[in-house]
């Protein structure tokens, strides 16, 4: 089962919600829950996820949480879609902090166009078609970043230089091998 966190405010009746989620998982034969929480604006989320994890675990089910909400007993999702740093270093640091047995890879297929310089580290997401169109319009060498475990190329346009980071079958396999 997948849970999102697009609601506003605190979660009312956390225990009731946890019981309802577990009952639905049992009813439908689900193996666990993925907490797809992209932000953490409310202080009750970690408590909610820890309680949910305990209830799921008691029924032999798993809870997968983002690293930003490391709920007790949950498997923690480590995103592989980096735009800076090193995937290996992130995995090693996270394994040391939480234990390798608690980690699960969130294998993200990245396709992003970054203007240079890019102090925010946030690029523009690309569709596969947009990526292919950029490659055709700006033919240049494609390189592999051992740190990011992704491929990239650069191009110049009227607005300046761009760095395009992307994954393919080879880079996704390399990320899994980490």
Question: What are the functions of these language-model segments?
Answer:
Residues 30-34, 102, 178:
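Residues at the N-termini of beta-strands
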Residues 68-87, 112-126:
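Substrate-binding cleft/loops of secretory-pathway carbohydrate-active enzymes
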Residues 70-71, 97-99, 156-157:
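Extracellular/periplasmic catalytic domains that process cell-envelope and extracellular macromolecules
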Residues 106-174:
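Glycan-binding loop/region signatures in secreted carbohydrate-active enzymes
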